[in-house]
């Protein structure tokens, strides 16, 4: 039976780990769970897109879901959020955010690379509409619209 590697998070760390696991083990099943809409994007390039140093949106993406799956033989599950991990049973509970369905996957190996959440310090006016965080492509689109309106 094939060994199953489950990787939580599909941006820089998770995508790199999936590619490395594939190089080390050509026969295992590798599943990447990413709750967002994109895999393997250049998150350090996001401010450059807003500031128009990077003009083409597609240049932010190292791989698409399809190209990553084809190149590394990895099952990429975008818009799938890991809800819980049972280390004893070696199972993870996952929610497909598009279908609004919850399912369970067994795994032999589990790697966690879920990313981060922006920190907003408790200071006056932190919730002002002109203050924003930047962590992912969704934030980038929103902030780019604001930038174009305000030309800040």
Predicted regions mapped to residue ranges:
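FAD-binding core/adjacent interface of flavoenzyme oxidoreductases
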Residues: 2-6, 66-152
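Beta1-alpha1 glycine-rich phosphate/pyrophosphate-binding loop at the start
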Residues: 2-75
């Amino acid at each position: 039976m094939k060994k199953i590697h489950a990787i939580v998070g599909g941006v820089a760390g998770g995508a790199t780990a999936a590619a490395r696991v594939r190089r080390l083990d050509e026969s295992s099943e590798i599943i990447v769970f990413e709750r967002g809409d994109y895999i393997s994007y250049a998150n350090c390039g996001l401010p450059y897109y807003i500031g128009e140093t990077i003009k083409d949106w597609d240049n932010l993406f190292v791989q698409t879901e399809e190209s990553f799956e084809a190149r590394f033989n990895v099952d990429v599950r975008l818009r799938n959020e890991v809800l819980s991990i049972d280390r004893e049973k070696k199972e993870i509970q996952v929610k497909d955010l598009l279908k609004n369905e919850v399912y369970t996957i067994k795994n032999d190996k589990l790697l966690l690379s879920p990313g981060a959440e922006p920190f907003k310090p408790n200071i006056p006016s932190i919730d002002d509409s002109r203050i924003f965080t930047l962590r992912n492509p969704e934030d980038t689109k929103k902030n780019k619209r604001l930038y174009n309106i305000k030309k800040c």
